[in-house]
Amino acid sequence: MGDMGILETLVLKEKINGTEKAVIFRELIKKEMELLNDYCAKNHLFPKDYRIEFCHLHNIKKVNIARLLTILKYYDPRFIEILMSTDPKVRTFIQYFMEFLEKHPYFEDVLEPQNLFGNWDYIRYKLKILFPQLTFEEIDRFKFKRKEFINYVKEKLGEPEELIEDKLNLATWYESVPYLELESEMTPGVHPDPVMTPEEWSFIKRHIKGRKNIIIRDPDTGKEKLVYVEVDIPDEELDKYYKNREGLKKLLMERYNIDESGAEQILRKAGWEATGWHIVPPVHTDVEVVYPEEEKKEEKKVEVKREPFDIMELAKHIRYLGGRELEMLNYYELVHDKVPEIHEKLHMFMRTKRRLLGKLFGIYYTVDPVMAEAILINDPENIELLKSLTISTGLRDKKFSIYDSSKVWNEIKRRVRFIFPEVSEEEIEKFKGKRSEFVTYLAQKLGKPEEYIDERLERAGWLRSEEIPAFIRHVGP
């Protein structure tokens, strides 16, 4: 016990005061910063595809540490204020970000890492900070032209390619874009206006195609059943239904002989939640790197050379990072009950930390499958869980009440709050299980017809049947 540091001493105390809480979070931030340094410490030893994944996790971790700083602000209000106001460079650079927020239609939705990283508007402001000699006009000429940008900067500024590469990764302009679902319960943001950009329409067209698993009611037995629909509609035909959701729904019903509910599920899976209400496309699925035509004309057979590396060293590095993340998780578990006032922010931080561990495990599977598989199958109960990863079990004849699952109910509340920001989550919670009463209450509060409220709740997923809507309990892709 005599060797315990200040952090260990404080988290093991029965009661801690406000000052001690501030000290705890400063110590935690210090440890997280040290762990952050370890993520890319050995990148020079590993092939590029692994470096890209570590670099992306590195950036996700930075955003998560920023959440810790907002917690520290709760106990030390002057902390962030001093960070903001001391150096004039901060005032200069933050103006770029404010411009970014003003021009972006989705505001807080864009701040989530899965939407932020890879977003060109976000990248260009980071490039302006990392390459202050360049103008925005120069930077914008190279949108989707990463290789050309590197060559241009080498010639104009004389910076070595390795340094430019590092700066681009810091700006989240990766050579390729890894998919990182860090929060499984996280749904894409929705755009509640009747505006649909060409990028959003391209996203919906792309995601409406392919195999879709949908739940429909058997016309003979009246029971629910799971069916697969292979959607294959050419882009030219889909373009006729740009902004015409009802028309596209009818086309799906006629072409694939499915009912309206099934067509709705396909549209929602593609991101078109309702008329005038579609998803904010996750940026990673929309990044396309386009290089000039003249480069494509030179058809050369290129030998793909795999960079030599020590696979045991890579496995060791991932185990080390995973162990450190677990060690940090211990501290948050110990401090959790002592800080009820910041539970919501702490839960978000811990959830992302667990997802980081999950992503590390995914990378680990590629270098040490024996241990990875042993972790998964050692407990027989896990076998059933693994089987249900792609197909959800127990669907038929089951009544899906939104109140049975706290996760589903929280998602419904989030969606209702998105459509009706005038009500708090606490107000919604009071009407759990009492939808009709909530309709009356909200109609009176907002001075709107009950039919209007009822329809909007239906769109948000709080159905009149009070069952879980298909787009929340969707199965498969």
UniProtKB/Swiss-Prot annotation:
InterPro entries: YjbJ_sf. It comes from the Bacteria. This is Uncharacterized protein aq_1545. It comes from Aquifex aeolicus (strain VF5). The lineage of its organism: Bacteria, Pseudomonadati, Aquificota, Aquificia, Aquificales.
